[in-house]
Amino acid sequence: MSLCSLAFTLFLTVVAGIKCNVTDVCAGSPGIPGAPGNHGLPGRDGRDGVKGDPGPPGPMGPPGGMPGLPGRDGLPGAPGAPGERGDKGEPGERGLPGFPAYLDEELQTELYEIKHQILQTMGVLSLQGSMLSVGDKVFSTNGQSVNFDTIKEMCTRAGGNIAVPRTPEENEAIASIAKKYNNYVYLGMIEDQTPGDFHYLDGASVNYTNWYPGEPRGQGKEKCVEMYTDGTWNDRGCLQYRLAVCEF
C-alpha cells in the first residue's frame, strides 16, 4: 500500500470515530499538550500589604557637632519657705574698750543740747502749772480727770507712777497742781486689810501723812486716798474721777 492510501485510510478511521450531535458540534479527544509559551508582559502593581512589625534599632550614628552656647539666665524663682532657726552661736571675742564718754566732744555737745531743751520744756510747763520739780522728782498732769486705776495705768504707760508725796515739800507741789486745776488728786497709796492702815503701791509702809482732821474714817470701805486743794488727805472710794498727776 502506498503512503497516500495509508494516510487516507487513517483519516477515514479517525473521522468514523467522531460522534456529532444534532447541532453539528463535534467533541474531539484531548490533544497532546503543546510546548510552553513565551513569558507574558509584566502585570500591574498589587495593593499595599499590611504594615509589618517594627524592625530592630539601627546602629548608633556618628557624633554630632560642637555643643551650642549656654542660654541666658532664667527669671528668679519664688522665695522658698523660711528655714528652721539655727542654734545659738558661740559668744564672740570681747572688743577693745571704748573711749570714756567725757572724752567724746560730740557726745558731750549733744547731751548739753538735750539737757537744755529739757530744762526749757520743764520751765514752760512749770509756768503753766502742769509740771513741778521737787528734788529729784518731777510731778506732772495732763489735766484729765479719771478713776484711780486709769490714772495708775496712764502713769505707767508714760514711764512714771501715780504721784505720792513722801515729804512736806512734795506734798506742797502736788497741792499746788490740784489748786491750779481746782480738783482733788488721787495719791499712790492704798488701804491694807486692817482699816486705817495704808501702804504705797510698791508695798512699803507709808512714812509721811497729812490727813484732814478726823480722817481716815472709812472703816475699810474707802480704799484709796485723795488730796484736797489745800494739801490735806481723805480716804475715798477708788471709782471717783480725780485729777491725774504722775511722778517721774
Curated annotation (Swiss-Prot):
Keyword annotations: Calcium, Collagen, Disulfide bond, Extracellular matrix, Gaseous exchange, Glycoprotein, Hydroxylation, Lectin, Metal-binding, Repeat, Secreted, Signal, Surface film
* BP GO annotations: cellular response to mechanical stimulus; cellular response to nitric oxide; circadian rhythm; opsonization; positive regulation of phagocytosis; respiratory gaseous exchange by respiratory system; response to epidermal growth factor; response to glucocorticoid
Q: Where in the cell is it found?
A: Secreted; Secreted, Extracellular space, Extracellular matrix; Secreted, Extracellular space, Surface film
Q: Name one Pfam family in it.
A: Lectin_C
- Ranges for region Disordered: 31-99
Q: Where is the C-type lectin domain?
A: 133-248
Q: Which domain of life is it from?
A: Eukaryota
Mostly located where? secreted
Q: Which residues form the signal peptide?
A: 1-20
Q: Which residues are glycosylated?
A: N207
**From the UniProt record, which GO molecular function terms apply?**
carbohydrate binding; metal ion binding
Q: Where is the Collagen-like domain?
A: 28-100
Per UniProt, Ca(2+) binds at E215, R217, N234, D235
The protein's matches in PROSITE patterns, at most eight in alphabetical order, are given as: C_TYPE_LECTIN_1, C_TYPE_LECTIN_2
Here the disulfide bonds are: C155-C246, C224-C238
Q: Where is the composition biased (Low complexity)?
A: 69-82
Give the Basic and acidic residues compositional bias ranges: 42-51, 84-93
What does the miscellaneous comment read? Answer: Pulmonary surfactant consists of 90% lipid and 10% protein. There are 4 surfactant-associated proteins: 2 collagenous, carbohydrate-binding glycoproteins (SP-A and SP-D) and 2 small hydrophobic proteins (SP-B and SP-C).
Role this protein plays: In presence of calcium ions, it binds to surfactant phospholipids and contributes to lower the surface tension at the air-liquid interface in the alveoli of the mammalian lung and is essential for normal respiration. Enhances the expression of MYO18A/SP-R210 on alveolar macrophages.
Tell me its family. Answer: Belongs to the SFTPA family.
Please report the name of this protein according to its UniProt entry: Pulmonary surfactant-associated protein A
